[in-house]
Amino acid sequence: MAVVSEYLDRVRRDLWAQELFTFIPDRDLPPASNEATVGDGPRIAFAGFPSDYSLAFLLAALQLEVRPCGIITSPGAHPAILGDNALSRIAAHLGVPLIRAWRINDEHARLHLAALDAEAVVMASFDQIVGARALAIPRHGWLNIHPSLLPLFRGPEPVYWAIADGAFETGITLHRAAPKVDAGPILAQGAVAIQPDDSAGTLTKKLVSRGVELLPRAFDALLADEPGTMPDLSHSSYRTSVGHRSLEEAATAAEAERMVRAGFPNMLAWAPVDGVPRYVCSAKTIADRETRHPVLHYPDGGLELVETRATCGCHHDVADCPHREGAVASV
């Protein structure tokens, strides 16, 4: 049977009541007052972060006929991971170990992983490349959940780049993890249209919803050792991590507007306003006219900065990130 827990049901309801999902790994939860009732299905571990994206897939995996045996996270992504957070609360509630693996491929981490005796690992947002020896520890391997239509937009920021590049469609891919980034055999995949007003936050929620629908099928395929379909990497695209991009880099107002939507809420674009860096949460293209908000000017028109703030609130550990040092990040 699936995990039975009023606590997790409440966490699930609260999560899906949000208008948008983030990748920022700083979520915490109130502690549960008791332990969950777990089933006796296949032993699975989960790898991810205390973010909306990861949490949604952890909660979905626990609704399958499984027996959770551990949670794995990567503590270098955010200071919150070293303390109490959503993953540590759920691990305690399930009565399973939480492995904070600084280097998932070293011997110490692999011994901890082997001790879980997992039949499979479900992974949703993890900032380390899992090597062949770690991938081979669970009997049926690792299922990775990547928010793009692989092989397009491989890499760490696929939702950002789909919006910033002006794509009309993206999707979610559930694939067998391989030692190469986002390159393993595909077990399930679904497309999601990108609307003209989608931000990274609203699009991520749509992608997760589609991924949750596909998870049972992909998980069954993983346990059945189905080979999946190899992506054609000759037609792939790989995009790098994103820093706080300056809207002055944009060639047009349309491009700048996409940069704003792509950066919200995970990694905000910025622009100088009266000589001071401001981080832009929302903006719209306009013809040249008077407005009460700051306007950036481009060859194709203006970009009205509808909502800005003084700090970025990002999770990247960058020494000169503005919310730490008061200067524009150089990433």
Give short role names for the model-derived ranges.
Residues 276-280, 301-304:
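Short, isolated positions in well-ordered beta-strands
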Residues 1-270, 285-305, 309-316, 321-331:
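One-carbon transfer enzymes
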